[in-house]
Amino acid sequence: MSRRCELTAKGAQVGHKVSHSNIKTKRRFLPNLVNITFISDALGRQVRLRVSTNALKSVDHRGGLDGFLLKAKDAELSPKAVDIKRQIEKKKLTAELAAQA
């Protein structure tokens, strides 16, 4: 499992640990990743993803997983998240066609 957020593609960064005597040592800054289960309103089921806490805040801001995925770019999403996005788009399209008929 990679240390990368499945929604925002946030990953590890490299920087320096600086001591009191100003000696710089390479270190990695890892993202704060959590395993969380989202509920998709469109799909009517639970979706388990590994996301950063920053992405979790963004999902809440956009009104849930469905709203976040529909506005997100495919390049930033993991293959699993892109698949979920396609399922949501398909479900919404069929719901709109059923409402018109």
Curated annotation (Swiss-Prot):
Gene Ontology MF annotations: structural constituent of ribosome
SUPFAM superfamilies: L28p-like
InterPro entries listed in its UniProt record: Ribosomal_bL28 (IPR026569), Ribosomal_bL28/bL31-like_sf (IPR034704), Ribosomal_bL28_bact-type (IPR001383), Ribosomal_bL28_sf (IPR037147)
Record has S-adenosyl-L-methionine as a keyword: no
CC annotations in GO: cytosolic large ribosomal subunit
Pfam families for the chain: Ribosomal_L28
GO biological process: translation
Record family assignment: Belongs to the bacterial ribosomal protein bL28 family.
HAMAP family hit by this protein: Ribosomal_bL28
Name recorded for this polypeptide: Large ribosomal subunit protein bL28
Species the sequence originates in: Rhodopseudomonas palustris (strain BisA53)
Lineage summary: Bacteria, Pseudomonadati, Pseudomonadota, Alphaproteobacteria, Hyphomicrobiales
Gene: rpmB
